[in-house]
């Protein structure tokens, strides 16, 4: 009988999460800047709280409790900053180019995981992420650099911090509780920022925001599960799988066909991911 190791399970959870995150990016792209980033974030987080609340209420009193409030507040505002940067980047860049910068997050996760978690990544992990970073540079092509890439880098940084900090969450705080508190604690600041930029929205825009909220909620949940099962340095490269998804979605939905240079950069970004499945799979034979 074949059984996946905890690292392999975490890897697949993260790949599935990146599929949902990629679809969430498509929802933002379809909005095409018609809704301000602050308004988008506030409505998305409000919907997230409404969806999670019934599930949170079913949790036991122990798992519902807010633990490590400072850490949860920190993570909630990472979501705000990263989401705002993401909306700007996706609106002004192609899906593939914006996400190529987003997926610099695993490169940032290596030093962060070393500093915050005391993890010791292998030489192959370091070389793999450096190879991925070379791919990012090829996709961006400094001669054609877009100012929105700075916002994409902001998203990558907050994503790296968000994922690594999940390892410090108390075990007594369930995934549902973590998602609930992260969404709820982000609302006050998001609401204040939204007041300055509020404008009427139609049903179509609200539907896209709601879909994006649900999809990113699934990603956050899967990411929490994944990074609790394995060290960030061991599975962070799986974040690159989302770049494959957004490239395909960009071609399908928006006719954003990458040229050969961009395609080469994307291949360099995802190449380090290819051997992970084989390396982390365990075969256990039960008599």
Residue ranges and their predicted role:
Residues 1-19, 49-74, 123, 184-211, ...:
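Membrane-interface interhelical linkers
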Residues 99-104, 169-182, 220-251:
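Helix-helix packing/entry segments at the starts of transmembrane helices
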Residues 26-29, 37-38, 52, 144-201, ...:
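Transmembrane alpha-helical segments that form core, pore/gating elements
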Residues 16-23, 27, 73-91, 154-165, ...:
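Hydrophobic alpha-helical transmembrane segments of multi-pass membrane transport proteins
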Residues 142, 244-287:
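C-terminal-most transmembrane helix of multi-pass membrane proteins
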Residues 36-48, 88-105, 145-158, 202-216, ...:
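Structural signature of hydrophobic alpha-helical transmembrane segments
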